[in-house]
Amino acid sequence: MSLQTIIDNAVSIEFNRRKLAGQSVSRSGQIKIASVANNVPWQMTVEPRPGMRYADYRDLTEEIDRLDRIFIEVVDIGNTNPGLAYITNYQGQCNTAQINQITVSSGNALTLTLNVSSVTGTTSSTIMFEPGDFVQLSGNYKYPYTVTSRVLRGSGTTIAVPINRPFIDQAGYTEAGAGILVGKNVTWQMVMTKQPSYRVVPGGFLEWTDNFELAEVIED
């Protein structure tokens, strides 16, 4: 049991993907906006479920204390607990076999270029991705993205997939030829930035004193 358990049993999960930006208002009333290019790490605030029996979750408290705000854990949303899959479900029109036929050509800036020349059973109007679909390179690639606009199959051998943040080149990872993961199969590497304490109340129930705040760790 671990952070994954907290997520799987969450009452709610709040997502923060805001870019680093500042606003100022001039004396003439004009709003000026300045943004800084960065990796836009995922941040999550997880409200833990009440009513856990302490005797059943002692190993969870031990693991949370071990992780502290030091160690990273790889987590998913909707794979370990299918009840959360509605958050991450893939909404494009490809089936699993077709997704497995897609390979990566390159990633650069805000675009992921995918090779679809081997994908069978599609037409030029097949919806490959819908806005909000989650996508990640397969294997040991660490960073997930969301698609920002609808992508059709078209007639070429590649498709350009617009993504929510600048593509992250992971050290030691070969992008060209890699497969992709979509939907509930993507993962995040997260660390606690705020770790609540816990207490045991009458009846033997476990209560957390606050929400868990998690941040994506970007090492590249």
Model-identified regions with their sequence ranges:
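Extracellular/virion structural assembly segments
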Residues: 1-220
